């Protein structure tokens, strides 16, 4: 209809390109930070650490519970701590835990040390990139393109998720699971640098203030 045509035309305007880039990169980064590998390939990840099937299933329950609990904590802290700070700390925290996981997998079989570090990584993700990305996406797009821009960013997120899941077996085969976690650590560092340089704090800002700040970039 006419409204959708107007929205799409506004989306293609060069003036909104900077904010679209930020939104699309954050959407892709939420997936390519790598934590969904733990969820989608949990049994394989834990098997590589020496756990049997029954232990792996128990570990999956633990990681799922941690994810839920810390997501609720994030909902209560997002306005106090700020979106940008949570995204930056989450990116660095994941980079550190992935680097540590890579070292553990490379040097030992892992065992419960792997489970502990993975639980920490999930807690970090659940308090930062998982929920806060959606909060930011809802705040950074100008009103005139918000609907179609959110739809486009969501599409980018799911495409990134699909690619992440499809490519992991090939990455693991090429560089082993330790190398895979080091690759995700590097992606998290790149995400941290992007957020630090391109994303302003949106907490307590009106939509108009956020738009002015982002469209100047």
Name the predicted role of every residue range.
Residues 2-217:
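Alpha-helical transmembrane bundle of multi-pass membrane proteins
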